[in-house]
Amino acid sequence: MTQTLSQLENRGAFIERHIGPDAAQQQEMLNAVGAESLNALTGQIVPKDIQLATPPQVGEAATEYAALAELKAIAGRNKRFTSYIGMGYTAVQLPPVILRNMLENPGWYTAYTPYQPEVSQGRLEALLNFQQVTLDLTGLDMASASLLDEATAAAEAMAMAKRVSKLKNANRFFVASDVHPQTLDVVRTRAETFGFDVIVDDAAKALDHQDVFGVLLQQVGSTGEIHDYSALISELKARKVIVSVAADFMALVLLTAPGKQGADIVFGSAQRFGVPMGYGGPHAAFFAAKDEFKRSMPGRIIGVSKDAAGNTALRMAMQTREQHIRREKANSNICTSQVLLANIASLYAVYHGPVGLKRIANRIHRLTDILAAGLQQKGLKLRHAHYFDTLCVEVADKAAVLARAEAAEINLRSDIHNAVGITLDETTTRENVAQLFNVLLGGSHGLNIETLDKDVALDSRSIQQSMLRDDAILTHPVFNRYHSETEMMRYMHSLERKDLALNQAMIPLGSCTMKLNAAAEMIPITWPEFAELHPFCPPEQAEGYHQMISQLSDWLVKLTGYDAVCMQPNSGAQGEYAGLLAIRHYHESRNEGHRDICLIPASAHGTNPASAHMAGMQVVVVACDKNGNIDLDDLRAKAEQHAANLSCIMVTYPSTHGVYEETIREVCEVVHQFGGQVYLDGANMNAQVGITSPGFIGADVSHLNLHKTFCIPHGGGGPGMGPIGVKAHLAPFVPGHSVVQIEGMLTRQGAVSAAPFGSASILPISWMYIRMMGAEGLKQASQVAILNANYIASRLKDAYPVLYTGRDGRVAHECILDIRPLKEETGISELDIAKRLIDYGFHAPTMSFPVAGTLMVEPTESEGKAELDRFIDAMLAIRAEIDQVKAGVWPLEDNPLVNAPHIQSELVAEWAHPYSREVAVFPAGVADKYWPTVKRLDDVYGDRNLFCSCVPISDYQ
């Protein structure tokens, strides 16, 4: 039969590229699970009353090439002015060797958060380097492995200051008036929910205020002034006030470390170490504190430990501080950090080294000095005598200056009374400075760059002598040996080889949705039209961004069944926080601000209670029945008991137990009956798209993990995006922004992140995914995700009991394998199985969540039948190994499971085990071998001997 032109055009070609099993393989798997078709399987699993009659209308699929061309045209509407706005964002030069070998490399961007350290040593080393950079530049003892952005880090610093303060009755937090406005905005949002009073005043007046538990200062003020706060910090410390200082990585190369001046906490953005502005993000924040406060620090910390053979190995330390363990008592709710961006900054420091960084910082400062000298020579006045890279210039005719700047395609900071702000960066040249003279002075000014350079080189006093750094930085060998591109390329490759990412094998982590991050989706993020825009540039310069964001928002509205979407949250956890704040403010608008009870099922992800606590709510736990579903009787009782103060319920759908609960609509109705709102966690949205939707189910607000369902890669632990969808009555209460007016905002709510649209530069990834999949492709993706999970469950259920199932014994898009009976019989644990899977070439499933002693498996739709079968065969082979232990063939204390993973050096070492080397490292005929570089880590040693800076170089060799 002759094919039609439409068939030959094959506009849905990407659907077949994204979805792993082809039609024939899908039918094989359907036969294995006993279903006739994808629609029949979905019909059996998803409750009838929540199934959509037709898929959401998000358009037909486009080919990769058509979608790229369409997005390129949209990006072309952005105007690439040279931005000297500053305010925490500058243009950068990302070294091409890092661009090609990390940012564009799936070996780096498709990895997961390093909870399994044995398969994560490469990015853990890069993160340890990031911590070392932070320690050297801040002068403090402990550093985290990144936070979401600078403003979030400021809010975390405030919360930490309260936790560690000895002034228990103090409830006021002082913020210096020249911090960045977006930082103050986010701090105020957080302070409101915690009940703190925020005082904003000139830093010199910090001592005038009583009952202050913490103070936030900024070393280089928002308008450029360098402050020597050593005397003030000393006086504040005498009063037992916790002092936090916001700092700039590049400025710290030349300026004295705030830790050396007595600061307790130092934080800031690492953006200018090689990470493009990207219209606001993603960017990594750095965070450091004194050793005495280490157990109160937010975020992840990479620590040096030992493996089972006594060799140095790295791991995430002190995880008991995190939300997946401590729930509402966690230090923060940060589930996603910014690993990929922290590692770019880390490798930027490695590549340039201390000499290169000082050259860059000195060049920026020299050009700023030249600009300042020329302007002063022509009679213009500078607001500040001491500066690093930013000048605040008083101008008589501000409108004329701004008009000349616009004509020259230059952005200056324009929100300062009778003055303009100018921030230079590593991309600034002498030609740029000459152009700035023309903009600020008009025509024939007669200034000569070379002459000015000679003058300032002989006598520069723009940095106070007391503020000049007098100690060495980055002395560790890792920052002093990889300065040629060849060496750098090989170093990065050596790190990459240590890790297991999606470019090598399936990552079957439950509740994580480790699906394909297609190359066509990733390409646009490095386009300069998207990468080079300042988040506070005039809106007419970002029309392409606004069109793309508007289209993506419209698609997400249709896919979720909500009425509006807010793009600001930088992670799923931050989305939860933003959604709960919207609920809180909604109740307050109805004079029901007393409603503060948040119902959370016992099965919930730990981020839920941590977010509720952060939003100022009290958590009340709702029981689950023996099948893992929400206990409706207990829900009704709790809702009625707390009816007067009920704020909301947080529920995940499909449930965290991997089933579609039949009573989800009834759950929503009960909560609404007693005046509460329904927060539906979007972590499992990959099993809803095109089949049902939160809004259709009856929820009021959800966050969407764009780094799960909508293909933004996990980056080894970030970036992420957690936009929230809301019903119309909550739309006025989503986050706003103090610097940029967000279109459609009816009221001005506080911000939750530094940039108005969060990590805007990675939104093209989700735009591309939806555009290339279309309505039918998105539905098919959800259906195949469900098929893949049920195929695994059906083939493994006789070897490993599936803990929870729904109707007809089916699961949703993931399944929980119960290891507890095996452990009771044999002593082999879920940890042993997880580590043994490494020998088979797999990342482990999610361990002991949501139920201790289990493994939760989520294959996603992107894995083909061959990879699923390989995983199933590995799990069955491991079950056979467990039976060998049970039968006494191998002793419990010495077998391939408890000794896993095995490393290459064991092949040539003395062998005294009761199983062969072949069984150890090539089990069940494994051919495409992944080699871990360390054996199982000693977690207890790592936490008891916390060490978070670089180890001797010999340990890397």
Swiss-Prot record:
Pfam (any one): GDC-P
EC number: 1.4.4.2
Cofactor(s) annotated in UniProt: pyridoxal 5'-phosphate
InterPro entries: GcvP, GDC-P_C, GDC-P_N, GDC_P, PyrdxlP-dep_Trfase, PyrdxlP-dep_Trfase_major, PyrdxlP-dep_Trfase_small
Gene Ontology CC: one annotated term: cytosol
PTM annotation (N6-(pyridoxal phosphate)lysine): residues: 708
Family of the protein in this entry: Belongs to the GcvP family.
Protein name according to UniProt: Glycine dehydrogenase (decarboxylating)
Organism: Salmonella dublin (strain CT_02021853)
Gene responsible for this protein: gcvP
